[in-house]
Amino acid sequence: LVGNIKEDGTYLRKTKNHFQSLNIQEVSGLAETVDVKNKQVKLVGGKSLAYDKLLIATGSQPVRPPIPGIDSPGVHPCWTLEDARAIQKLAKPGARVLQMGAGFIGCIILEALASRGVDLTVVEMGNRMVPRMMTEGAGTLIKEWVQSKGVTVYTDTKVEAITPVQSSGGIVSKIAGIFGGSSTSPLQVKLSNGKTIEVDLVISATGVRPNIAYLKNSGIEI
């Protein structure tokens, strides 16, 4: 998001035969269940893979808070390269951006957004920034420093609803109109502190959950 790294700089494997060179067999597919008794991983489509030892490294996915309007156009997580592309298109200088969440990863995201020259508001439901890692004093210092950089921060605050509205001249709509592109309607974001904010982009940085649904009833202790 800052622009210091091109997309190809995010690739961990630089050659097509990366796995082969390490004597690793690559199989593309979705794991459906794990049969612990017979030591097999069953894939969607019927194929099974036998194992002696099983490493579970299936990653995680962003949490989608149960907020009305969370699936509206213009609301994005910041998790994948595709997410970053979508955010780059909307987070133009002067764009009004609201970020939900001010944890460790959220602070990295907000720093990148601030460097892009957006009008940024951060909403954190905890009583301080980075609530799971910082004491109240340290979290307050971070909040004060972020505010000194021109970012609006609301702690002890939740997003209650997100509502698309008719375009009212947001910077993203203006830019899109000039270049003949399609635009995303502005969004009204209702907060628990009584404020309602109109923005061009909402970023959800409210945590992640592990991709382990396929392990249900497998006998593996999570």
Question: Where do the model's predicted regions map?
Answer:
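Rossmann-like NAD(P)H-binding beta-loop-alpha module
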Residues: 86-134
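Residue-level detector of alpha-helix initiation sites
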Residues: 60-62, 82, 104, 129, ...
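A general structural signal for well-ordered alpha-helical segments in protein cores
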Residues: 64, 84, 106, 139-143
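A Rossmann-like FAD-binding core segment of flavoenzymes
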Residues: 26-34, 38-42, 49, 115-222
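Conserved phosphate-binding and hydrolysis motifs of nucleotide-dependent enzymes
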Residues: 52, 59, 101-106, 194
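Glycine/serine-rich phosphate-binding loop and adjoining beta1-alpha1 elements at the start
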Residues: 44-89
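Nucleotide donor/acceptor-binding cores
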Residues: 53, 73, 94-96, 118, ...
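Glycine-rich flavin
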Residues: 1-24, 61-64, 83
